[in-house]
UniProtKB/Swiss-Prot annotation:
Entries under Gene3D superfamilies matching the protein: Cupredoxins - blue copper proteins (2.60.40.420)
Stored PANTHER family: BILIRUBIN OXIDASE, CUPREDOXIN SUPERFAMILY PROTEIN
Compositional bias (Basic and acidic residues): 1-25
Gene Ontology CC annotations of this record: cytoplasm
Lineage of source species: Bacteria, Bacillati, Bacillota, Bacilli, Bacillales
Residues the entry annotates as binding Cu cation 3: 149, 380, 428
Binding, Cu cation 1: 107, 378
Residue sites binding Cu cation 2 per the record: 109, 147, 430
Cofactors demanded by this protein: Cu cation
Name of the protein in question: Multicopper oxidase mco
Binding site for Cu cation 4: 375, 429, 434, 439
Organism: Staphylococcus epidermidis (strain ATCC 12228 / FDA PCI 1200)
Length: 447
């Protein structure tokens, strides 16, 4: 027969179990901010056939809410990290740099590699130190991820921003969407709590698993997704510290479940709901071709909106725009401004073009984790024609001959450029302080 002491202990245990299983209320996304997608990490192949990457764990600042900057962590940036795209058979070499003020490791979650380079707690890289690892990819296509794994600071470092995706790309042809950032979309779902609109792990930490009240997708608060009327592939990662997700579409539409943690299924499954545990990945394909302006949402537990999805029609001009020959990426704010990652160098010619030759330039104002700002882009010595903005016909006030085009963060335009004279000309942001801080390049026009 149970005595009173044992009965009291069991009652307390039951209360604790109930408490541990409770989910903190998660507020729905208001759908105010378009999500952005992590950049794809660049690699260089060396003479031994290795693809060389560099990943740097570093401190940063992120404006989750306007004019409120949080201290965050990121790989090669302020928050999260670039996507590594690998293929089966690739030989890979990665320089790992710790620019934090505490120990960290680089763990390759789901990657089947030698334990010496797995990045567990015993493989610490001290502050200010670096090391280089090598491995060969020996598994089929899958969506994996990388994150720190130091003891005892894994939870804190992941919560503050250290996460990134690693793709082993499709090894065989299939009909799944594969255009990164267009219809093949990396979706990192996390939950966090903000204190006075700022991230503060120490004030929100829970030893039984930290859950937040605010949903983020790819580091964006109140996220939304605008997609074309076509099939889209969502590579879902539950990057939360502790929250389980039960995901479905708000209109109860079915979708194709095509891949689990370990890779693609032999046969896709038609489902209406999936569970996603912390660190788990699943890939689904949603058919938006019949939406015709309808709005749906990816929801958790039937009610909490994780990601509103709205529809934009396919461009009627698809295929009519000539091939792009030059790409311009405008990035940054203040004195951290660049064009294609470079500061102006008077001794460097960035592009060349033939006299009287029509070329199409693609101008992109990159929206980063700080949000970015509008940049007016100017080319010397010519007048150009705006062909499209974000794949659509340009607005009426952008038509006619122009020498300046102003783009909001995240916007991308195509312009037709012809030079009628030879020589070396400048192209730059026409915010004068940005120009003087190096947001400028040179093009040489020859016969």
């Amino acid at each position: 027969m149970m005595n009173m002491k044992e009965d009291k202990k069991n009652t307390m245990d039951m209360k604790n179990m109930k408490h541990h299983d409770e989910r903190k209320k998660l507020n729905s996304s208001q759908g105010k901010n378009e999500i952005i997608f992590p950049e794809v990490a660049e690699s260089k192949k060396d003479n031994n056939g290795y693809k060389n990457y560099t990943l740097k764990a570093q401190e940063g600042k992120t404006e989750f809410y306007k004019n409120n900057f949080s201290n965050t962590l990121g790989y090669n940036g302020n928050l999260l990290g670039p996507t590594l795209k690998l293929k089966k058979g690739d030989k890979v070499k990665i320089k790992l740099i710790n620019n934090l003020d505490e120990n960290t490791t680089f763990h390759w979650h789901g990657l089947e590699i030698n334990g010496k380079v797995d990045g567990g707690p015993s493989q610490v890289i001290k502050p200010g130190k670096e090391k280089t690892i090598k491995f060969e990819v020996n598994q089929d296509s899958a969506t994996l991820w990388y994150h720190p794994h130091p003891s005892p600071n894994t939870a804190k470092q992941v919560y503050n921003g250290l996460s990134g995706l690693l793709y082993i790309e499709d090894s065989k042809k299939n009909n799944y969407p594969s255009n990164y950032g267009k219809n093949d979309l990396p979706i990192i779902i996390q939950d966090k709590t903000f204190v006075s609109k700022k991230l503060n792990y120490s004030k929100t930490k829970d030893e039984d698993g930290t859950q937040g009240d605010t949903v983020l997708v790819n580091g964006i608060v109140n996220p939304k997704l605008t997609a074309k009327e076509e099939k889209i592939r969502l590579r879902l990662l539950n990057g939360s510290n502790a929250r389980d997700l039960n995901l479905k579409l708000s209109n109860n539409q079915s979708f194709e479940y095509i891949a689990s943690d370990g890779g693609q299924l032999k046969n896709a499954k038609k489902l209406k709901e999936i569970n996603l545990a912390p660190s788990e990945r699943k890939e689904i394909v949603i058919d938006l071709s019949k939406m015709k302006g309808e709005k749906i949402s990816l929801v958790d537990n039937d009610k909490t909106v994780i990601l509103p999805i709205s529809n934009k029609e396919k461009s009627s001009n698809k295929g009519n725009t000539p091939k792009v020959s030059k790409k311009i990426k405008l990035e940054g704010m203040n004195d951290h401004v660049t064009i294609n990652g470079n500061k102006f160098d008077p001794n460097r010619i960035d592009f060349t073009q033939k006299l009287n030759q029509k070329e199409v330039w693609e101008i992109e104002n990159v929206k980063d984790k700080m949000g970015g700002m509008k940049h007016p882009f100017h080319i010397h010595g010519t007048q150009f024609k705006v062909l499209s903005v974000d794949g659509e016909k340009p607005p009426k006030d952008m038509r006619g001959k122009k020498d300046v085009i102003s783009l909001e963060p995240g916007q991308k335009a195509k312009i037709e450029v012809v030079f009628k004279n030879t020589g070396t000309y400048m192209f730059h942001c026409h915010i004068l302080e940005h120009e003087e801080n190096g947001m400028m390049g040179q093009i040489k026009v020859t016969n």
